[in-house]
Amino acid sequence: RAVKRLSAITLLLLGFFDPCLADKPNILFIAVDDLRPELNSYGATHIQSPNIDRLAAQGVQFNNAHVQQAICMASRASLLTGYRPEYHNIYSGESVGDLLPNALTINKHFERNGYQLAAYGKIYHYKSDHVAQFGGRWSDGSTELFDNGRYATQDSLDKLELNRRDPVRPHEDRGPAYESADVEDGAYSDGYNTARAIETLRQFKLSNEPFFLAVGFRKPHLPFNAPEKYWEMYPPGSIKPAEIREAPRFSNQYTLRDPGELRNYYGMPKHKGESVDLETELTLRRGYYACVSYVDALVGKLLDELDSLGLAENTVVILWGDHGYKLGDYDNWNKWTNLSIDTRVPLIVRAPGLEGGLQSDALVELVDIYPTLADLSGLEIPQHVQGTSFVPLLRKPDLEWKKMIFTLWPHYRDKFDQTVTGFSVKTEKYNYVEWTRLATGEVLATELYDAVDDPAETINVVSLPGNDEAVSEMKILLEAGWQKAIPIVR
């Protein structure tokens, strides 16, 4: 032992030994479904999110983080495998296990490097992927809970049964679009899973091995179900409707998708083109906000437990949303576009030894998370990973970084149809989209939004006078691809 210690000291003096790598940090990996960057720390003062705000005050908040594709499984597939959509070929209902059975996912990479694994809730999309990735170390809800922690009242289950027999749009598994129930946090699966995750943290504390604990919150995804006390944080009279009511001017047939997701729920408009009334819109928005505050409280419980166990000082905490969401914006209730309201997400990282309370406006992508966490942990970044570690931004948030980032969206018609896909390149100034017929390469439509002068993306200016040069430049960037966006760190 004395020889080993002397060797370490000698290496340290010679500059070859990094003591930080001798004690790998733990990872608390927090995924939140359908979470918009509509949090107090992001400037949304109407939202009560004190615990996520606390995390931001202790870490680095990214204000310009975007997903690769604005739908649950495809977005998560890029983050968890390190592959971009064009390479993993997951666009909607496919699973990682079906298309990438041998992929070295982020959790597998950490496991191979000596990390203990555990996961609760929604990390991937399908149960089969969770079981394949985590085995018996994953769980989601419990049969001990009413309705397995989805709905909390019999009234909601009665409405679910009515919805199964709806004459216009029946759905086997959708009840009301929202629920306010006088129950404890643990009555819903998110609260139950948080309690289980806390138990696991206590078990991990007894071990000398680092851990990778993934906690995936299903809220604020539809249905907007949360304990009543979180609804009460938002009095009905305080809720405002969406500011942008119409589709972007000069948009095309591919820009938006009909809001079929909301129509699946009981009591919601069932016909295409039918909008929700104002009262329903305000109730839905209130329910979404309640769910955000519910998840925020659960995040707070996890952070508090890290503190009480003495684990916070050696744990990387990362919180991310898998895509944005339209709460009546553009008269839509879904994600599923290349518009920034759907691709932009909250991303916050707190890492040991790094300054907190910082914000970065740099362009980053969720595919960058895999290499970043590997980098922070002193692990090799696998060669297949197509993202870029943004650890330099954690140290210097205003560092010159990526000039552009990339998203895509395969167009839906009556059923999923990949023959026409919208490829988007985003810079600090513009969001440019080309809708391309994949079989021929023909560009059918284009869009250009000015992110500086029109951050809500209300006008497609691609054909307006004075934008020819911008269109040409953005087209070149799109064709150059993500490899040309890798920053050079000096």
Kindly give the residue locations of the regions a language model identified.
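Formylglycine-dependent sulfatase
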Residues: 21-435, 440-444, 455-486, 490
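N-terminal secretory signal peptides that target proteins for export/translocation
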Residues: 1-3
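Residues forming the ATP-binding cleft of Hanks-type serine/threonine protein kinase domains
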Residues: 452
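Sec-dependent N-terminal signal peptides
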Residues: 6-16
